[in-house]
Design a protein with these regions (language model features):
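Hydrophobic alpha-helix/coiled-coil detector that fires on Leu/Ile/Phe-packed helical surfaces
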Residues: 1-16, 25, 36-42, 54, ...
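Short, solvent-exposed beta-edge and connector elements
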Residues: 3-4, 47-49
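Exposed loop and linker-edge segments at protein-protein interfaces
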Residues: 47, 57-88
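Short aromatic-glycine-enriched beta-strand elements
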Residues: 31-33, 58
Length: 92
C-alpha cells in the first residue's frame, strides 16, 4: 500500500567523469586515497579528490588521470614502494 508521489527527474549534463570502484577507495585523517600501480608495477599511494559516490563507484575529481591503474583487490596486502603482479579486474 504505497503512497502516490510525484517525482521530477533532474538529469545533469555531465562531461565524462573518472570513476573507480568504491572498494579501491581508502580514507585516513588526510582524506581519500587509492593505491595506484605505475608502469614498473610499483605501488604508490595517491591522494584523490572524491566528488561523490554512487552505485558502487567513486567519482574522482583530482589525483588520477584516465588510464591509470588502481588496486581494487588485495589493497590491505600492499604498501607504497613494493612491486606487484597486477592483473586486470573483472570488467576493466
Amino acid at each position: 500500500d504505497g503512497a502516490l508521489v510525484r517525482v521530477q527527474l533532474i538529469a545533469e549534463d555531465l562531461p565524462e567523469v573518472l570513476t573507480v570502484p568504491q572498494q579501491a577507495l581508502q580514507r585516513d585523517l588526510g582524506g581519500y586515497f587509492v593505491m595506484a600501480v605505475d608502469d614498473a608495477n610499483r605501488v604508490e599511494q595517491r591522494r584523490v579528490g572524491v566528488e561523490r559516490q554512487v552505485d558502487g563507484l567513486a567519482v574522482i575529481g583530482s589525483g588520477l588521470e584516465p588510464g591509470e591503474r588502481v588496486i581494487v583487490e588485495g589493497v590491505n596486502k600492499v604498501r607504497p614502494g613494493i612491486t606487484v603482479d597486477a592483473a586486470p579486474a573483472e570488467g576493466g
